[in-house]
Curated annotation (Swiss-Prot):
It catalyses: (7R,8S)-7,8-diammoniononanoate + CO2 + ATP = (4R,5S)-dethiobiotin + ADP + phosphate + 3 H(+). GO terms for cellular component: cytosol. It comes from Lysinibacillus sphaericus. Its main location: cytoplasm. Mg(2+) binds at T16, D54, E115. One of its GO terms (biological process) is biotin biosynthetic process. It is an enzyme of class 6 (ligase). This is ATP-dependent dethiobiotin synthetase BioD.
């Protein structure tokens, strides 16, 4: 069984969308998949009820029944870095408990997709002793990196990949999320791939979130790699 992380070069690069998309497409292949968000921040109120966007996305678009109680470790109301959001509520994030929860999920599901919060160096405690990257290292799981296509993405993506590779974390591939119509955006993608020859897929900006129902990623080099790993491990 191959479990993995979905991490981003920054916040709001599309990690939740990609996590949900990978979940759905793997489920279509008959794989039992659950997403897991160790820490989520930013409670949303729609006038009737309060919810968290990330885990709500998982449940809404999953093709399989998910265990709501085990989709998330910590949820904090403030839309902020986990360490600060936790501090506002007088809490501390127990990373060992998160790792334990991940391990338990791995015993139940074929694939657990762990979605990161923000970028790799997001702090998880007020002292700055533990970052998301530290948890990824300790989990010993590979990663899929989500990045933008816009100006600035080359630097952000290469820094992220360097941080991962120097810590000997396996990178399964890249997801380029955003517009791809301009020569600059296309060149950004090709330039990054010149530095790191990795499986990848591109996702254009979809008009509606519900478009995820029909969007297929089968045939992309990244998805083919994930499927091959699933087949070889199972």
């Amino acid at each position: 069984m191959q479990h993995f992380w979905v991490v981003g070069t920054d916040t709001d690069v599309g990690k939740t969308f990609v996590t949900t998309l990978l979940m759905r497409n793997l489920q279509k292949q008959g794989v039992r998949v659950t997403p897991y968000k160790p820490v989520q921040t930013g409670e949303v109120y729609d006038g009737e009820q309060a919810y968290y966007f990330d885990t709500a996305m998982y449940e809404k678009y999953s093709l399989q029944l998910l265990d709501r109680e085990n989709l998330n470790g910590y949820s904090f109301k403030e839309a902020a870095s986990p360490h600060f959001a936790a501090q506002l509520e007088g809490q501390q994030i127990d990373t060992q408990q998160l790792l334990k929860q991940m391990q338990l999920l791995q015993q139940t599901w074929d694939v657990v997709i762990c979605e990161g919060a923000g970028g790799l160096f997001v702090p998880l405690d007020a002292c700055g002793e533990t970052t998301l990257l530290d948890v990824i290292v300790e989990s010993k799981l590979p990663v899929v990196v989500v990045t933008r296509t816009a100006l600035g993405t080359i630097n952000h993506t290469l820094l992220t990949l360097e941080a991962l590779t120097t810590r000997k974390i396996e990178v399964l591939g890249l997801v380029f999320n955003g517009d791809m119509g301009s020569r600059m955006e296309q060149d950004n993608i090709q330039t990054i791939l010149q530095y790191y020859t990795l499986p990848y897929m591109t996702i254009p900006k979809l008009e509606e979130l519900s478009d995820i129902n029909e969007y297929a990623i089968t045939g992309t080099s990244l998805f083919e790699r994930l499927i091959r790993r699933e087949t070889s491990i199972n």
